[in-house]
Amino acid sequence: MSDHYHYPLDASWSTEEITSVLHFLNQVELAYEAKVRAEELLKSYAAYKEIVRSKSQEKQIDREFQQASGYSTYQAVKKAREIEKGFFSLGR
């Protein structure tokens, strides 16, 4: 995963929460840079949603992450939901 940009993290999150959010964002990165298992991405998204409960905060994080990395959390989750099982890639 690239270390050329900053992740959109909330300073009020605990270490465990930051770890969960980073795991989800890493899964999104995998979807664009290689392949990711849909089930794993959806599992990490469920954990992410336990932390980022509001739709507005989720959209803000997606916007910030997309501006920094070029990767859309929304598109990755959408594709994972479409196929449900197996690997997929959103590579360019």
UniProtKB/Swiss-Prot annotation:
UniProt-listed Gene3D superfamilies: BH2638-like
InterPro entries in the cross-refs: BH2638-like_sf, UPF0223
SUPFAM superfamilies in UniProt: BH2638-like
Pfam families with a match to the protein in the record: UPF0223
Similarity remark: Belongs to the UPF0223 family.
Protein name: UPF0223 protein Sez_0908
Lineage: Bacteria, Bacillati, Bacillota, Bacilli, Lactobacillales
